[in-house]
């Protein structure tokens, strides 16, 4: 199995998805002690280290002999929830991720972020680093609800292959998305615990009441009760607030497609942030499966055969 290192692992959504897809995680890193604790309670064949990426060295990472480096650099400086400001410091973590990848030079890498990173000043700098190092790149924005996750959550993926061809995975990732969005009831069944729930909107111009017969809106790092001043929105799933409640922390984890046996412990606010920051497990698995299929196809179809096939068509 391809060996994987996860930078910015959090509580393990991206790692678990890649493990589910058939990769072997050999090491993970994060600088949040509470997330590392949860990670290590759930993964037994490798460990996460409490370490800031600025303290990691190329030599240390290279010793793990990774075939793939994955990671989702913290995205608050790009996200609408964080009032995008690249001067805050988190945006440079994307460049640090690129610096480490380009130093270690694994055959492949996968970087995840919010789709707003496409409008950032940081992404072109990271892309230049990857291209200068010889990576071919696939850039896609995926809708999690079309990739097996009962949640509307658009995420950007930058996937690199050393000495490959640009857009090598784009068609497979985009074309395999489902036409129907995954609904909570379809994914979790009738035993979810509630038919209707409240998710605090960013502004009262947006609705806040949803049904499990639709995908959830994006699970964020905050979870608030229904305010007494809430006014019914035209798009709300019901006008009867007596039938509505906020989701519990574990219900939010299930919508993020963490399995029921994934262990969580700690304070509510920390867990809400941890779960909201995670890459949905099934979205990570979707990307991982397509990458692994591509890897296996490359092994079974040597480059010389591909070049000969192309020559024969001319």
Model-derived segments and spans:
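Short, contiguous clusters of charged residues that form electrostatic/catalytic patches at enzyme active sites
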Residues: 51, 92-99, 124, 253, ...
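Receiver (REC) domain switch-region micro-motif
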Residues: 4, 69, 109
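Class I S-adenosyl-L-methionine
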Residues: 56-66, 75-218, 222, 236
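Conserved SAM-binding strand-loop segment of SAM-dependent methyltransferases
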Residues: 45-53
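S-adenosyl-L-methionine-dependent DNA methyltransferase catalytic core
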Residues: 2-25, 129-132, 155-314
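Conserved SAM-binding loop
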Residues: 39
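Conserved SAM/SAH-binding beta-strand->alpha-helix loop
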Residues: 32-33
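The conserved SAM/SAH-binding core of class I Rossmann-like methyltransferase domains
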Residues: 28-29
């Amino acid at each position: 199995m391809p060996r994987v290192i996860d930078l910015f692992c959090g509580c393990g959504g991206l790692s678990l998805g890649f493990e589910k897809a058939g990769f072997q995680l050999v090491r993970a890193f994060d600088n949040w002690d509470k997330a590392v604790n949860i990670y290590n309670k759930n993964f037994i064949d490798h460990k996460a280290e409490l370490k800031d990426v600025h303290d990691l060295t190329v030599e240390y990472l290279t010793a793990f002999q990774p075939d793939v480096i994955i990671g989702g650099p913290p995205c608050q400086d790009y996200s609408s929830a964080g009032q995008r400001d690249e001067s805050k410091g988190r945006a440079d973590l994307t460049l640090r991720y690129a610096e480490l990848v380009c130093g270690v030079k694994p055959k492949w890498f996968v970087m995840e972020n919010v789709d707003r990173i496409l409008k950032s000043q940081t992404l072109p700098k990271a892309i230049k680093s990857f291209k200068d190092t010889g990576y071919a790149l696939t850039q896609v924005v995926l809708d999690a609800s079309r990739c097996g996750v009962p949640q509307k959550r658009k995420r950007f993926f930058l996937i690199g292959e050393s000495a490959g061809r640009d857009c090598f995975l784009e068609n497979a990732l985009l074309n395999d998305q489902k036409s129907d969005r995954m609904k909570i009831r379809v994914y979790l069944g009738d035993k979810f615990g509630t038919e209707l729930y409240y998710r605090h909107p960013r502004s009262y111009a947006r609705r806040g009441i949803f049904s499990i017969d639709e995908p959830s809106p994006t699970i964020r790092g905050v979870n608030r009760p229904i305010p007494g001043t809430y006014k019914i929105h035209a798009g709300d799933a019901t006008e009867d607030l007596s039938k509505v409640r906020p989701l519990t922390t574990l219900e939010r984890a299930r919508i993020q497609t963490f399995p029921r046996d994934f262990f969580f412990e700690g304070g509510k606010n920390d867990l809400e942030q941890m779960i909201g920051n995670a890459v949905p497990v099934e979205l990570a698995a979707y990307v991982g499966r397509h990458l692994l299929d591509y890897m296996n196809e490359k092994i079974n179809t040597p480059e010389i055969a591909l070049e000969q096939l192309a020559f024969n068509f001319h």
